[in-house]
UniProtKB/Swiss-Prot annotation:
Name of the molecule in the record: Baseplate protein W
Annotated function: Baseplate protein that is part of the outer wedges of the baseplate. Probably plays a role as a connector between the central and peripheral parts of the baseplate. Plays a role in tail assembly.
Keyword DNA repair applies: no
Main location: virion
Length: 115
């Protein structure tokens, strides 16, 4: 299969293709607080404002919705079918996104550390 997209890995400068770039892009979207980019104030997610809140079922739902809405708005290459969260005892949180790559129909499953 030929890559439809070539980009650059932010950490080592090497070439990345389709799914690698989508993963990098979604990580950036979720970790960027809304309002923090000067020329694009609405870019990012509301996730940063929720990270240190008390653990409740309502907060977990808000986190999932914040992730889903940010990816829906800023990453048109994927369609999500589920968003799940997991927190470890040391306070780290990961978000697992499952869905489909829109161009190829290929299933997509990404686990992204967000804290």
């Amino acid at each position: 299969m030929t890559a439809r997209y070539l980009g650059m890995n932010r950490s080592d400068g090497l070439t990345v293709t389709d799914l690698e770039h989508i993963s990098q892009s979604i990580g950036d979207i979720l970790r960027t607080p809304v309002g923090s980019r000067v020329m694009r104030r609405d870019y990012g997610s509301l996730l940063a404002s929720m990270i240190d809140q008390p653990q409740t079922p309502a907060l977990e739902l808000q986190i999932k919705v914040a992730c889903y809405m940010a990816v829906l708005k800023w990453e048109p290459r994927v369609t999500l079918s589920s968003v799940t969260t997991a927190r470890s005892f040391d306070g780290r949180m990961t978000v697992t996104l499952t869905g489909q790559h829109n161009d190829t129909g290929q299933p997509l499953s990404l686990t992204i550390p967000v804290s």
